Structure formats: structure tokens, C-alpha cells
Amino acid sequence: MLSNSELPDRLRAALQAVDHRWRDVPLEPLRDKGLAHHHVRLVGAGALARVPKQSQLGLSAAANLAYQRACFECASVSGCTPQYLGFLPVSVDLPRGALLVQEVVGRSALLPADLPGIAGSLAALHTLTLPLASARAPLLNAVDPLAALADEIGEQAAHVPAVSLDRSVALTLDRELGRLRRLCSATARPERRFIAFDAHPGNFIVDAQDRAVLVDLEKCRYSYPGLDLAHATLYTSTTWDVDTSASLTVRELLDFYAAWSAATGPLGTGAQAWHVPLRRAMWLWSISWCVKWRALSGLPAMANADGEDWAAERSDTALIAHVRDRVDHYLSPGIVGQLLDEFDALERAFCA
């Protein structure tokens, strides 16, 4: 298991083993902010090394690198994501390998001021030309993305009996999952597009040109843009990262959706009826993930380098304390009720 203190020496050895052109550049570990990766700056190279702690999709170490490479390469055409620069293979020094990507220099997103920029960047992703189905691998491309999402939420919610959870919250989770499954039983679906599926504001850096750059691209897939729009603006997303924390009003949410719709033309017009249903689904995914993390984070780290691993010991203690605080907050009855009220308010506004 890699720690931040070990990273420079391990990364240096991996660079030297392949005689990489950046083998001798200074290496600077960044603050531990995420549960899936360490990040190391290759000083002077304009590059970052993304060193996986785990695969959130449950992939082998090599498959995880290939998946992330595809994410960056597909998204880069949009002009609002970092460029893919290469990879370091799975090795003794880096058991999960590393991806090398362009370093984006800038600041954290400020909400609500940067919401129009985030909407524009997501619109650029969502309006990319959809490749033929045969050319979409290795990215997820479920036969029915809505049903696949409901199944994933169900798998996460299966951890409810193993955790301490307020009964009203458990009942709400079960009721909302039932609502989603009923939606799946109908035939109507929104338009499928390339999406990030991890578009919370903490994953954006605003550069010197005021461009909102989406820098974390490990879970991209072909699914529904409304999931990204929700993940960018849900309370469980906007208050996740301390550097971007904000609570948005219904008016600010409506303005965000309007900005995205204006930038996407017919796609935006057809998507409006799905904004609230997909927002509820993305929130349900988020809080069921919180349940899963609460259940699994106390387990010891896995000995091998493949698959999913939420062990708290893989991350800095300050980061884990922050995540635990957020998980407890989002699973509290008051916050669950607050989100349900927001969904109702948005539904009324969209129908007005």
C-alpha cells in the first residue's frame, strides 16, 4: 500500500525503469484530496501523475489504467479536460501503475459564480459526437443505463443492514429506489451521450481563461447528461469538497440548467423532463454510496492491487475524517428531508 511519503521514490523508480523523459524532474506530491488517487506534480513538465489507490469500477490494475486512458482521450476532444500524456505500467514500484496527464493550473471553482462555466464545459462533453456502439469500449455502455444505475444503487443499498442508519432514512432510501425501478419499467428514456459521472464541483479547476476544466475522469461512460448536471449541483456534491463548498438556491439551480440547455440546443430541450428524475437518481446513488463507504471503510486494505478498496488506511487521516463527517451529514434525516423538498420545488418550477 502506497503512502504519500513513499510516492516520490516509487514514482521516480517507475519513471527510471522505462527510461522516461521525465525520469529526473523534481516530484511534488499534492495534498491527499481523493479516495481513488494520489497525485504527484512533475515539476516543470506541465504534468501530473495520477497514481490509483483503487478502482472504483472494480477493475484490475491494468484494466483500470486502460479505462482511465480512454476517459481522458475521449473527453479531450471537448477542450474542457486535461490532455492524456502517457502511462506507467503496473510494476513492483507502482502496483496499480499511473496515468500521466496535463497539469491544469488555476483555482478551485467558486459557487455560484462559476456555475455557467461548469454548465458550458459539461455541454461541451455532452455534445461530443456519439461513436458507433462498436467503438465505445472499454467505456461503460449499458444496454439500459437507467436500469444499470438502479442495479448499482441496489448493490450499494444492500449495505444498509450492516450500518447504523436512522430508520426514516433507510425507509426513504428504499422508497426512492422503488420509485426509480418503476421509472425503469416504463419505456421512455433520455438521450444517451458521453458523460463524466463524477462532475462534482471539486473536480473542476478554473484556468486563467476562466475555463472550467473537469480534471477527474475515471468513471466516464455513455449514459444520460442529466446525471452530470445533478452531480454538479446536488447539495451532496457542492458541499463535498471544502475548497468549493456552497449551498445553492432553487433559482441558482434553474439558472444552471438553463445555461446548459442554451449551450446544447435540441439535446437540452428534450432533456428537461428528465432533470428531476435523474437528479433524484444521482442523489440516491450518492447517499447509497455513503452507506457503502460507512460499511466498508473500516475494513483492512486489500493485499492485492486489483479491484475496489475503500479501506480508510489508504488515505490521509484528515481526508478520512472529512469524508466521515460528510457521510454522516448526508445520511442525517434533516439533510435527506432538505433534498426531498428541493426535488419537489424544482419539479414545480420546471412544470410552471
Protein language model regions, located:
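Conserved protein kinase catalytic core
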Residues: 56, 108, 204, 222-224, ...
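Active-site acidic catalytic loop and adjacent metal/ATP-binding pocket
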Residues: 30-43, 48-49, 180-227
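Active-site activation/catalytic loop segments of kinase-like enzymes and analogous catalytic loops
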Residues: 229-267, 280-299
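A general structural signal marking secondary-structure boundaries and capping sites
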Residues: 19, 76-79, 88, 126-136, ...
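ATP-binding pocket architecture of kinase catalytic cores
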Residues: 30-152, 189
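ATP/Mg2+ or Mg2+-diphosphate-binding catalytic cores
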Residues: 288-352
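A cross-family kinase active-site recognition segment
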Residues: 87-91, 107-172, 182-193, 219-223, ...
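An alpha-helical support segment within catalytic cores of ATP-dependent transferases
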Residues: 7-23, 130-197, 208-209, 265-271, ...
